[in-house]
Amino acid sequence: NANLNEVLGVEPEVTLGELREEIERAGIDPRYQIPSGMTKQAYLEMRLSDAIAEEDDYDLMVMGRTQGQGCYCFVNGLVQTQVQKLQSHYPYIVVDNEAGMEHISRGILPMMEVAILVSDCSRRGVQAAGRIAKLMKELNFKPQKTGLIVNRVPDGKLDAGTLEEIRNQGLELLGVVPHDDQ
């Protein structure tokens, strides 16, 4: 997600989106240079370790965003490749995606044990979470567990309409996060 690092108070040295810009603009824009004799692939491999912010209890890799026009295909491919490389080094990998279905429909994260969908307490938000859960089934994703966390809930209590929509979508409610003005 483009702002999870901000919520956690982590400033990465570089994001995957910024790496994409470096690679795309190398040789065209003098601000972006790859060392002489080094291929773009070798440079990318070297710089990917800079995209992981190492904290006391976790490490964080930030996708970020591109600086200009362009497809996220390259960055999405980086995320997929890095998750595959890193999964043997960590007991857990949490991927915080932007809202929507792109990461699921593109198969960027094909292997997952647990899928936690997060929604606000609006009917539309819960319906979107239900569509994502259905898409995962259609695309043959097989997490061992799929559930919903509802975020920003007034007084930490879901109203009857939201609970009914969660049931209608066939989602398992894992928990709620109360609204916090801070």
Regions picked out by a protein language model, each given a short descriptive name:
Residues N1, M63-R65, N97-E98, C121:
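Fold-independent oxyanion-binding glycine-rich loops
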Residues N1-D56:
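N-terminal phosphate/diphosphate-binding loop that engages ATP/GTP or pyrophosphate donors
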Residues N3-E6, Q69-G70, H103-I104:
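Short active-site-adjacent helix-start/loop capping segments
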Residues A26, P30-Y32, C71-C73, H103:
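Functionally engaged cysteine thiol sites
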Residues K40-D50, E54, D59-V95:
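Cytosolic-facing regulatory segments adjacent to core modules
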Residues C73-V176:
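Conserved catalytic-core segment of NTP-binding enzymes
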Residues Q182:
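C-terminal boundary of histidine-terminating zinc-finger modules
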